[in-house]
């Protein structure tokens, strides 16, 4: 009996150890899955630096999106004057984006990811130190202040084509949607920081006796913080290693008697039709966004009297919720197909503008804006990834820049008209016009691209050998 009891106790101990091991294994497995979802094995050191730089630069864009419209309104800018400023910013950003996109395919991408944030830092210091109109217009244009305003204002400015091309070159096609989802997540994280903690920082410091809470002092202090974040974004990109794309050799000089032709940008026969269709859809989208995109903060300020300390936290809450969309973007595309997923996202963006501008209270309008941003933040990385996937690697920087050029140029046309409508007609009308144009853009995008699949979807549909 003693021997049997000992054996029973040993068996019970063994079973307990086995059960503990089995219960520990799922926990370890869940931890590994969670870790892999956040930082998969295919990510690299350079991706980490670029994502960190994206967080910092996105934070500055989000903070500027809250500060600039309200600050300029407080120092006397009308809706029409704001529209003129945003038009100048859109034109300069379009020119810079096109130039950087083309040059990045030839000179390399890293230099622009370092220098452009430092231009934003200089612009922030100018806003902090002077009200002189020509300086404000000039440096707003150089720093791209006035683009990407609103919750989740995580754009990073004119260097985005260079950044997209550098990141797209670093992964296999099957991982590209996931990588761009993480880029969008980093943008949302930066926007969360910029529109949340950084907008309330002056008030927090004021509780400790610092003189940064009266008059325009909170705005000027925040511009100095913005400059510091922009400097840090450029510094973080310095350690990134870049492999230059291999291009076809330069053609030999023409032989005697042949007519010399000025060299110009050449894209492959496969890429040109894609670019033309992107130009058409992005032109309409640029017109739409120009009517309301730069004015989101200004509209909340005019419609509900909400200042930066109220609008900023609202944007932070919206951005926090929208971050989930970034990480689900790849699954959404795998379920519907990337073109259908982008189409659904754009349709929702157009529809949800209308109840937002008709909402009687600030927080109800904020709730509709939240729903719209959930759709927008899911569609944005998919569109960027899709464009990078359907063009040749050596043309990605050029296409990323050139495809957005009509959008940025068109978005320079509508802000001035929107500003006039804000001042003289109705606050809701520019938003309603923008919603109609976005609906047209949605139909155009689906018609133009429904038959053009990215490589990862084409590979899945090929029959096994």
Predicted feature locations:
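C-terminal membrane-cytosol helix-exit motif in multi-pass small-molecule transporters
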Residues: 194, 198, 202, 206, ...
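Transmembrane alpha-helix termini and helix-breaking/packing motifs in multi-pass membrane transporters
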Residues: 69-70, 74, 191-217, 298, ...
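Hydrophobic core of transmembrane alpha-helices in multi-pass small-molecule transporters
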Residues: 55, 123, 133-159, 166, ...
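Juxtamembrane intracellular "pre-TM" segments in multi-pass secondary transporters
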Residues: 24-44, 242-284, 462-465
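Helix-to-loop junctions at the C-terminal end of transmembrane segments
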Residues: 96-108, 202, 325-338, 422-423
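Helix-loop boundary and gating motifs at the non-cytosolic
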Residues: 34-94, 274-315
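Central cavity-lining transmembrane alpha-helices of secondary-active solute carriers
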Residues: 84-102, 316-328
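Structural signature of the two symmetry-related core transmembrane helices
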Residues: 111-126, 340-355, 435
């Amino acid at each position: 009996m003693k021997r049997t009891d000992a054996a029973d106790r040993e068996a019970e101990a063994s079973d307990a150890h086995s059960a503990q091991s089995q219960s520990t294994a799922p926990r370890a497995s869940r931890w590994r899955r969670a870790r892999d979802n956040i930082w998969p094995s295919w990510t690299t050191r350079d991706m980490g630096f670029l994502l960190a730089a994206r967080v910092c630069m996105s934070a500055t864009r989000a903070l500027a999106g809250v500060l600039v419209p309200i600050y300029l309104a407080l120092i006397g800018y009308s809706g029409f004057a704001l529209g003129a400023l945003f038009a100048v910013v859109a034109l300069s950003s379009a020119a810079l984006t096109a130039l950087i996109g083309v040059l990045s395919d030839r000179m390399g991408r890293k230099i622009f990811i370092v220098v452009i944030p430092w231009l934003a830092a200089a612009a922030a210091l100018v806003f902090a130190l002077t009200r002189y109109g020509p300086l404000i217009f000039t440096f707003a244009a150089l720093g791209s202040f006035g683009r990407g305003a609103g919750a989740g204002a995580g754009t990073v400015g004119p260097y985005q084509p260079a950044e997209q091309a550098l990141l797209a070159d670093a992964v296999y096609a099957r991982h590209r949607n996931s990588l761009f989802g993480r880029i969008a997540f980093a943008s949302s994280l930066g926007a969360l920081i910029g529109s949340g903690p950084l907008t309330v920082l002056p008030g927090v410091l004021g509780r400790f006796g610092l003189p940064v809470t009266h008059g325009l002092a909170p705005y000027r202090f925040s511009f100095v913080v913005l400059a510091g974040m922009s400097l840090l974004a450029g510094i973080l990109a310095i350690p990134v290693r870049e492999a230059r794309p291999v291009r076809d050799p330069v053609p030999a000089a023409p032989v005697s008697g042949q007519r010399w032709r000025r060299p110009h940008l050449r894209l492959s026969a496969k890429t040109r039709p894609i670019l033309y269709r992107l130009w058409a859809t992005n032109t309409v989208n640029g017109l739409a966004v120009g009517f309301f995109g730069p004015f989101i903060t200004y509209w909340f300020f005019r419609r509900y009297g909400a200042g930066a300390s109220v609008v900023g936290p609202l944007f932070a809450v919206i951005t926090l919720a929208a971050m989930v969309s970034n990480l689900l973007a790849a699954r959404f595309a795998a379920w519907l197909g990337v073109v259908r997923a982008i189409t659904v996202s754009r349709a929702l963006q157009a529809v949800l503008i209308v109840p937002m501008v008709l909402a009687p209270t600030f927080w109800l309008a904020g709730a509709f804006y939240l729903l719209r941003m959930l759709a927008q933040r899911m569609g944005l990385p998919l569109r960027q990834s899709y464009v990078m996937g359907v063009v040749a690697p050596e043309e990605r920087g050029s296409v990323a820049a050139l495809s957005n050029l009509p959008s940025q140029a068109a978005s320079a046309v509508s802000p001035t008209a929107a500003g006039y409508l804000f001042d003289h007609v109705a606050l809701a009308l520019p938003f309603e016009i923008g919603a109609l144009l976005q609906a047209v853009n949605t139909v155009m995008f689906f018609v133009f691209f429904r038959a053009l699949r990215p490589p990862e979807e084409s590979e899945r549909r090929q029959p096994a050998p």
